[in-house]
Regions:
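Sec-dependent signal peptide recognition
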Residues: 1-8
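Solvent-exposed, well-ordered loop and adjacent helix/strand elements within mature globular domains
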Residues: 13-143
Length: 143
């Protein structure tokens, strides 16, 4: 509990969190798991809303997400699920080089455990998703 309070205070002191790796993904088996339309928090992806840009959902690396239930599953490993954000939180993203990702996104998913300080933006595979590569200037704004 004390660690969570310290992290929250730290976030409020910071004006933003710099992201090391920002990418895009699609709800496909090759990029997710065997049920790509269900996110880590149990939300179902509505492909029609996604196609019409009505869904702005993202996945964060496990070091940025706070989830007590998942901490138990990982034997309270301090490197996972002890971050600043919870599933369902709305975050504000800013990027100078990729303005199409600027704005509000809802945290609904988490990334593979090999990623740290990373964000993955969900886009419709039929639409032209932005080609981010590894975007160097993405940050989550504390507003």
């Amino acid at each position: 509990m004390i660690a969570k309070i310290i992290m929250c205070v730290s976030l409020f002191i910071q004006s933003s969190i710099e992201i090391d790796r920002a990418t895009t993904y699609n709800a496909e088996v090759t990029q997710c798991n065997s049920d790509p339309l269900t996110t880590a928090d149990g939300s179902r992806i509505d492909l029609d809303k996604l196609a019409n840009s009505q869904l702005r959902w993202c996945a964060l690396s496990r070091d940025l997400i706070w989830d007590e239930e998942r901490q138990k599953l990982h034997n309270y490993d301090t490197s996972v699920f002890r971050g600043f954000f919870r599933f369902g939180d709305t975050i504000v993203v800013e990027s100078i080089s990729s303005p199409q990702i600027n704005g509000k996104w809802v945290v609904r998913d988490c990334m593979n455990k090999r990623y740290k300080r990373s964000i993955d933006f969900l886009f419709d595979p039929k639409n032209n998703k932005p080609k981010l590569g590894v975007c160097p200037d993405v940050r989550i704004i504390n507003k």
